[in-house]
């Protein structure tokens, strides 16, 4: 087939219109929209680029963002753990560099002076107390000496349950054991009168026997042997328990309590309670008499 040639013949009228057209005089001319459209075209063109390049550009933009000026709700900057740790270490190492010496106010000086005066007064009072303690120690020594003078030495040698017991101790004179020991000494002091008379009688008899005929002497009495110490006395269970009770009373400090609650004290308290009860009965009887008298008087007035 023969090739057909096509030729485009320009329209002369259109060319003339284009030559006489002024863009700025056109009513639809808006350069701002054209710029926006051009920007959109550029953006469209950029969107049409490679995906890999777009990702790289975005990462670069993210790295360039400065987050140091972002503030939290509490007002401070957002800090990482490493930043907080660095700040704490810096504060520990430089904590004494920020100290400032301030002038001491007058009130603090006055308080310091008051404390110094109080310490001086305390020292003076303590020195006075030391002197009083020394004086008290002297008085205590004198009282201990007086107490030692009031104490007595108890020496006992007796045989109980087949064993010989030797006792030697210091006790106060006013204690129960001391009183019992003193009573036993009184008994011993009163007892030797009879042996002396017996000795005199034996001597007279011996003299008479020498004059006449010598007879065998009688065996000396047991009481004399006990007093002289040749024969140790045997304690009965009752006497031993009495000694043990007296020593226990002194050791436990029950002497005053026993004196307070003895039989005489109990009887005295019973008498006191009886007197109080009788006084209450008398008062009750007196009040009853007054009530009866008032009732009789009211009955007589009513009649």
Swiss-Prot record:
Alphabetical GO biological process terms: chromatin remodeling; regulation of DNA-templated transcription
InterPro entries: BCNT-C, Swc5/CFDP1/2
Localization annotation: Nucleus
Annotated spans, Disordered: 1-92, 126-146, 199-219
Composition bias, Acidic residues: 13-29, 41-54
Keyword Transcription regulation: yes
Stated family: Belongs to the SWC5 family.
Record protein name field: SWR1-complex protein 5
